[in-house]
């Protein structure tokens, strides 16, 4: 958008105009970004599950959910309530501690990763300087929980699923990190807010997808593999492993895996939006919009409208990618485990290294275009 958009300042000034102190106005602002992220995560999962069911039904020439609310929109809530009231069973010969900790260790890093997702300049919980690498570090914890769940179940299918999950994550974590490193090199920052602001200097044409098309493809493939979406759902392949590492789980513990998968998918789509598609930026200039309605860009009304449009743009870009991921799941065949590992180690890793080298060379040759 524009460096002048500061929703926090506009909010505090508006509250102060009502007669409240600056300290109280700032205190009232603090929970708002957290509330936005929490609501976005919950609604994001519900909408994604509903889209998954409807798109899969369309792909298979079915109607899909239609009785739970209008167009079946309440079906995800019904699924959640069903899992909540089901009996929580721990297998007799399973390691009960690891069996319980595993799903928690899978879900918690995904939720913590939402700390660094910006919906606007001040609409994020934590603008840490190493935000994007913090996400990579947190995502590397998840396979430990998957392996722990597979091992503790005392089931051969669960163990194989856990081992596959660990191998898949290691194979795709490295090219994903190298693709992110190319973005960091151009942006001169690890902050997600700085990366978005750097993409909005010249509108649509300054988005990183035009300067990093190869990196965008690598990142998206690796993100799908990290989310274990088809064609990369080898750890839970139904035809081979029953349900993989989830085989022995039921009730709320199974729901944690279910929830983590969809939260991770929405999170990955949001990060692609932030890193490559300009985040909250949109083609219409805020300066042009403010002059059109005859108000200054510092006007609180313009600030609120601009921030709201930014949130909408971020979500629209993310859900375009979510729609693509769901469509891929129901229209592509599953790859074999050897093909999956070959793709990660023999293709994506060398290509991501070459992409990083080319980015460094272009940064030296064209410092203005590539963020010198």
Curated annotation (Swiss-Prot):
Its EC number is 7.1.1.-. The chain crosses the membrane at residues 27-47, 97-117, 128-148, 166-186, 204-224, 266-286, 308-328, 348-368. PROSITE patterns: COMPLEX1_ND1_1 (PS00667), COMPLEX1_ND1_2 (PS00668). It catalyses: a plastoquinone + NADH + (n+1) H(+)(in) = a plastoquinol + NAD(+) + n H(+)(out); a plastoquinone + NADPH + (n+1) H(+)(in) = a plastoquinol + NADP(+) + n H(+)(out). GO terms for biological process: aerobic respiration; photosynthesis, light reaction. GO terms for molecular function: NADH dehydrogenase activity; oxidoreductase activity, acting on NAD(P)H, quinone or similar compound as acceptor; quinone binding. It holds the Pfam family NADHdh. It comes from the Bacteria. Keywords: Membrane, NAD, NADP, Plastoquinone, Quinone, Thylakoid, Translocase, Transmembrane, Transmembrane helix. GO terms for cellular component: plasma membrane-derived thylakoid membrane. NDH-1 shuttles electrons from an unknown electron donor, via FMN and iron-sulfur (Fe-S) centers, to quinones in the respiratory and/or the photosynthetic chain. The immediate electron acceptor for the enzyme in this species is believed to be plastoquinone. Couples the redox reaction to proton translocation, and thus conserves the redox energy in a proton gradient. NCBIfam families: PRK06076.1-2, PRK06076.1-5. This is NAD(P)H-quinone oxidoreductase subunit 1. The lineage of its organism: Bacteria, Bacillati, Cyanobacteriota, Cyanophyceae, Synechococcales.
């Amino acid at each position: 958008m524009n460096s002048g958009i500061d929703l926090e300042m506009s909010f505090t000034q508006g509250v102060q105009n009502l007669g409240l102190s600056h300290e109280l106005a700032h205190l009232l602002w603090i929970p708002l970004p957290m509330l936005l992220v929490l609501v976005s995560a919950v609604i994001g999962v519900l909408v994604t599950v509903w889209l998954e069911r409807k798109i899969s039904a369309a792909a298979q020439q079915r109607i899909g959910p239609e009785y739970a609310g209008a167009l079946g929109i309440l079906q995800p809530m019904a699924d959640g309530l069903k899992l909540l009231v089901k009996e929580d069973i721990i297998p007799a010969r399973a390691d009960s501690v690891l069996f319980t900790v595993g799903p928690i260790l899978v879900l918690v890093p995904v939720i913590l990763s939402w700390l660094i997702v910006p919906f606007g300049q001040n609409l994020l919980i934590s603008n840490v300087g190493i935000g994007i690498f913090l996400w990579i570090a947190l995502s590397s914890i998840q396979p430990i929980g998957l392996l722990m769940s597979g091992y503790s179940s005392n089931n051969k299918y669960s163990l194989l699923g856990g081992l596959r999950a660990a191998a898949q994550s290691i194979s795709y974590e490295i090219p994903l990190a190298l693709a992110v490193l190319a973005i960091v090199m151009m942006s001169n920052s690890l902050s997600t807010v700085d990366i978005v602001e750097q993409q909005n200097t010249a509108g649509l044409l300054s988005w990183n997808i035009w300067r990093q098309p190869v990196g965008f493809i690598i990142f998206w493939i690796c993100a799908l593999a990290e989310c274990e979406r088809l064609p990369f759902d080898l750890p839970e392949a139904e035809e081979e492993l029953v349900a993989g590492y989830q085989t022995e789980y039921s009730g709320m513990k199974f729901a944690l895996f279910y929830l983590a998968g969809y939260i991770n998918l929405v999170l990955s789509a949001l990060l692609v939006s932030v890193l490559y598609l300009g985040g909250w930026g949109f083609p219409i200039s805020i300066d042009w919009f403010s002059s059109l309605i005859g108000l200054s860009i510092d006007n609180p009304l313009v600030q609120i409208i601009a921030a709201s449009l930014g949130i909408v743009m971020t979500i629209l870009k993310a859900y375009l990618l979510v729609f693509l991921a769901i469509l891929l799941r129901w229209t592509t065949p599953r790859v074999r485990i050897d093909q999956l590992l070959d793709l990660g180690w023999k293709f994506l890793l060398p290509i991501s290294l070459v992409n990083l080298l080319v980015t460094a060379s272009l940064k030296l040759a064209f410092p203005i275009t590539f963020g010198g």
